Design a protein with these regions (language model features):
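Conserved SAM-binding loop
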Residues: 66
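SAM-dependent nucleic-acid methyltransferase catalytic core
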Residues: 2-19, 25, 29, 74-187, ...
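Glycine-rich tight-turn/loop motif centered on a GG-T
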Residues: 204-206
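Short alpha-helix immediately C-terminal to the canonical SAM-binding loop
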Residues: 63
């Protein structure tokens, strides 16, 4: 990965860090206000170039953590982390200490304690139950606060504190974008309708993601397009033999929208050969403008499933 990009200290499964070099060059140049509607680990938002950034996520405890990191001196953050590690004797094997800290966090909701918990939790996942209690299990022999996380945290805090960033914790339906103009830009990486996983189920003790939410988001993006506001949507068209029919129809109904295939390497596949694995994950970045770096990628009609591989991807070869 290009060292020019800062990696989030939150190891979000499904995060975009490893494909930043593919998607960020597709963004418009000279953005006034960059809006990340589903910020998650903030890998995209923290690395996108703009005069102002708005990072939004409906997980209020995640945004509370970012706010804490935004206003707290780095030395104080690191001191708090070290104190908690020593106080609860946290390690790769001490599950009892982890459980005690988790109980403490659920009683107090200290944002920095949440960060420590995430560092030692299973797969570094962020999960809350319906009572808004953090309930991710211990990451035995795999998860801890290590040198890599510390390095990422330092770089992340530095950018978070020097950039012009507004942090919001709203459901995407309630996010007011009425003041945006043609110099602003909205990026969306929502939960994916046709995939499953704790990183994108949209729940974690909060609102889930189903067909209703998918339609509302696509309608919201159409509204931005009507106002002349540029947007980019990360999503999955195909996954393990499934097709996101809502997304496919939406693209067909909006012939000016552009599909930019993203190589995620989720499976052994090559999108530009007619023998592409039909069970491969096909991730795309849909834009309502032609990216400067791929100006020849006008959106063709999406063919039927029968000739999807043979025709469509041959037409979409990158130049």
């Amino acid at each position: 990965m290009n060292d020019a990009y800062v990696k989030s200290p939150l190891n979000y499964i499904g995060g975009k860090y490893r494909i930043l070099s593919q998607i960020i060059p597709l963004f418009p140049k000279d953005i006034n206000c960059f809006v990340d509607m589903f910020a998650g680990g903030a890998n995209v938002g923290i690395n996108a170039s703009a005069k102002k950034h708005i990072l939004n996520d409906n997980l209020i405890y995640l945004i509370d953590l970012y706010r804490k990191l935004q206003i707290t001196p780095l030395k104080k953050v690191l001191k708090h982390i070290q104190q908690r590690i020593e106080e609860y004797d946290l390690s790769l094997t001490n599950q009892d200490g982890y459980v005690k800290l988790r109980k403490h966090y659920n009683e107090r909701k200290d944002s920095l304690d949440l960060f420590v918990l995430i560092a030692y939790s299973f797969n570094h996942q962020i999960r809350f139950n319906n009572n808004h209690e953090f309930n991710n299990p211990f990451g035995k022999e795999k998860s801890c606060f290590n040198a890599s996380i510390e390095s990422n945290l330092k770089s992340f805090i530095n950018k978070l504190q020097i950039m012009n960033i507004e942090l919001l914790s709203q459901n995407f339906e309630e996010l007011d974008l009425s003041e945006l103009s043609d110099n602003d830009f909205v990026y969306c990486d929502p939960p994916y309708l046709i995939t499953t996983g704790t990183y994108n189920d949209g729940k974690r003790g909060f609102t889930g993601w189903a067909e209703r939410e998918e339609r509302l988001l696509l309608n919201k993006l159409d509204g931005l397009n009507d106002k002349g506001v540029k947007f980019a949507l990360s999503n999955v068209l195909n996954h393990k033999g499934k097709t996101n029919k809502f997304l496919e129809k939406w693209i067909l109904d909006n012939s000016d929208y552009v599909i930019n295939p993203i190589n995620t390497n989720y499976s052994n596949s090559n999108y530009q050969t007619k023998n592409r694995d039909k069970f491969a994950t096909l991730e795309v970045l849909v834009t309502n403008y032609i990216p400067q770096t791929q100006a020849t990628l006008q959106l063709p009609l999406i063919p039927t499933e029968r000739d999807y591989n043979e025709i469509y991807w041959q037409q979409r070869k990158l130049t």
